[in-house]
Amino acid sequence: MASQGTKRSYEQMETGGERQNATEIRASVGRMVGGIGRFYVQMCTELKLSDHEGRLIQNSITIERMVLSAFDERRNKYLEEHPSAGKDPKKTGGPIYRRRDGKWVRELILYDKEEIMRIWRQANNGEDATAGLTHLMIWHSNLNDTTYQRTRALVRTGMDPRMCSLMQGSTLPRRSGAAGAAVKGVGTMVMELIQMIKRGINDRNFWRGENGRRTRIAYERMCNILKGKFQTAAQRAMMDQVRESRNPGNAEIEDLIFLARSALILRGSVAHKSCLPACVYGLTVASGYDFEREGYSLIGIDPFKLLQNSQVFSLIRPNENPAHKSQLVWMACHSAAFEDLRVSNFIRGTKVVPRGQLATRGVQIASNENMETMDSCTLELRSRYWAIRTRSGGNTNQQRASAGQISVQPTFSVQRNLPFERATIMAAFTGNTEGRTSDMRTEIIRMMENARSEDVSFQGRGVFELSDEKATNPIVPSLDMSNEGSYFFGDNAEEYDN
């Protein structure tokens, strides 16, 4: 990529830093996760959680959500201006699960947001540490991506539900900054832009006045983020058209949907990073490990090593399968919801099955669920190998893929062919090449038709033994090329509802 020199690595985005060398990046990412860990340890002390309770992923999620809510300025301001019954804008809380007389009981806790912010800042050398907050948001986003399908959201914006492999990060808040933008899939960006354009169509003042000027700046910035994800000149040129449109409307929506479809074959660059639940960093900090001194990377071996040595528990409902619950969380930890299952399988070293075959619902427990029947299990989050997470979509070629999901978005930088369902995808492109973007559309369709199944992505890249920390001996897995590996294959995952 020609523009590589101007890009910050997403480790730098993650920590809000300017360009740094590798050691500085490792130190600042280490400082970030160390701060999360210290915060978690302190919260466990505040809440008097036992060791077992502190390792419960549901408790971790509640604590993470509390700190995110405490720092959500826009929502806090909104709550103060629009007081709703029963919501104290100055407080935050959630369910904490404790072990009492051999049973799990739910306790709803409430804390001052001020107090939570104080504890967070104290754990982060007195700073706001927005990078750490974004990191937690990305972990929640990865968990959502793995747990839910976004069919309804796709249909609502006029996209095809089978394009779910493009929807990484679709539940990330807009305030997640550059690190959040880096992990958003092409479909997510398209969806955000379409929602914006639709508001403009329905509300004539949307683009007008001082507010409209800010809206316009946000629109162009989102267009540029999406443009930066595309790897071909024609796709980028089409994004320029969309961005420069005087009055964005249905023509732009058409163009964006066209571009989203094209990304199923001409994949965009979407960053992947392993973001772990706060309790994992907490356990590591509590054991005396110094993240900042040792350094840390979100895309290397470090998260794998952490998960090899961490015991995390989860509440489990009566008819759920602990192995399946573990798979769900493992995939979320490595941001592998849209990765080819053949690759995930090889790295994890245990069978990774499609979402529809998992006997498990989401990790979080609804407030009306009966705690009497709840049990807990150990999550098996270890792996057989590790691999570097990719920020590119890989080059493109063609293979059989499944009914429910017709393409993948690679997570691991591992040599393989990238499956997609050519016939299904191309069927959507019939006779729609008129209008001002016709030459670009024609060019994009030509490239898609020429994508070949022999092409291999991530040539020579492999997985590594966990003892191979410096990544010196890549093992290129032999994947069954006849088999495809879509996770949301013909699926019945629950919808994500805000």
UniProtKB/Swiss-Prot annotation:
GO terms for biological process: symbiont entry into host cell; viral penetration into host nucleus. The keyword Ribonucleoprotein applies. GO terms for cellular component: helical viral capsid; host cell; host cell nucleus; ribonucleoprotein complex; viral nucleocapsid. A motif (Bipartite nuclear localization signal) lies at residues 198-216. The keyword Ribonucleoprotein applies. It holds the Pfam family Flu_NP. It comes from the Viruses. One of its GO terms (molecular function) is structural molecule activity. Keywords: Capsid protein, Helical capsid protein, Host nucleus, Host-virus interaction, Ribonucleoprotein, RNA-binding, Viral nucleoprotein, Viral penetration into host nucleus, Virion, Virus entry into host cell. Late in virus-infected cells, may be cleaved from a 56-kDa protein to a 53-kDa protein by a cellular caspase. This cleavage might be a marker for the onset of apoptosis in infected cells or have a specific function in virus host interaction. It is found in: Virion; Host nucleus. Residues 1-21 are annotated as: Disordered. A motif (Unconventional nuclear localization signal) lies at residues 1-18. Homomultimerizes to form the nucleocapsid. May bind host exportin-1/XPO1. Binds to viral genomic RNA. Protein-RNA contacts are mediated by a combination of electrostatic interactions between positively charged residues and the phosphate backbone and planar interactions between aromatic side chains and bases. This is Nucleoprotein. It comes from Influenza A virus (strain A/Equine/Miami/1/1963 H3N8).
